[in-house]
UniProtKB/Swiss-Prot annotation:
This is Uncharacterized protein MG220. Its main location: membrane. Keywords: Cell membrane, Membrane, Transmembrane, Transmembrane helix. The keyword Membrane applies.
Length: 93
């Protein structure tokens, strides 16, 4: 069996740790971006309803209470159902 020399072993470990760190950093940035978008969606939909906009054309894009576009909002993707304060994951079958 081929045995690595010490310098080669250090190079392999260094390369692996670099790629692991890079992948982890990308995953963290991606997760934070997703959370930021979700919070933004929830904030926009909440303010659209709080402003008392009853016109369908006015709050069609931001209202999480309308049944037509509720499934595209971050509240559904995060499992936050209307009228429920508990956190639940949506079940897909």
């Amino acid at each position: 069996m081929y045995k690595l020399e010490k310098a080669q072993a250090k190079q392999v470990v260094g390369g692996l740790s670099f790629w692991t760190f890079s992948a982890g950093l990308i995953m963290i940035v991606n997760a934070l971006t997703g959370v930021a978008h979700a919070v933004n969606d929830i904030f926009q939909s909440t303010t659209a309803n709080a402003n008392g906009s009853d016109d369908d054309n006015e709050n069609k894009n931001n209202s999480y209470r309308s049944k037509s576009n509720y499934f595209n909002t971050a509240r559904f993707k995060l499992g936050l159902t209307p009228g429920s304060s508990s956190y639940s994951f949506p079940v897909f079958s």
